[in-house]
């Protein structure tokens, strides 16, 4: 019986820690609001990464795309692809996204390494679903996406202004090259 208690306590604490970590990871930055009346079907498809912060998982990457498609169970498949210009190789990661609550609110969680989830929050999008501003769980995570390899200056300024108002340091953004 004592052995059982020695095992169950650490396992329970570990499970509790994982639950707390996962709930923290899918947050949205203070001051940011996810898009309401979100249309998942219009969001699916290919997006080009226009700008991001310097993340270790995207280090030295250009020509970055994200492709979203619906899985049979209603979750969303996420396929990220980018070219490592130092190693001269293409890298691809496949993950899954799920809505945090209501699928008409653009608050999702994404995982490339289950059971670890990260916040994925569409905080601005044009009415035609051609350009999107995506926030992660904190002010360290931000992406500007487009259906084409560039973005109109008016949309760029709109997204940068919104990000600055939330508290993002937009001077740290990396503007992704698309040449392949």
What are these regions (language model features)?
Residues 2-180:
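A beta-rich soluble binding module of mature secreted/lumenal proteins
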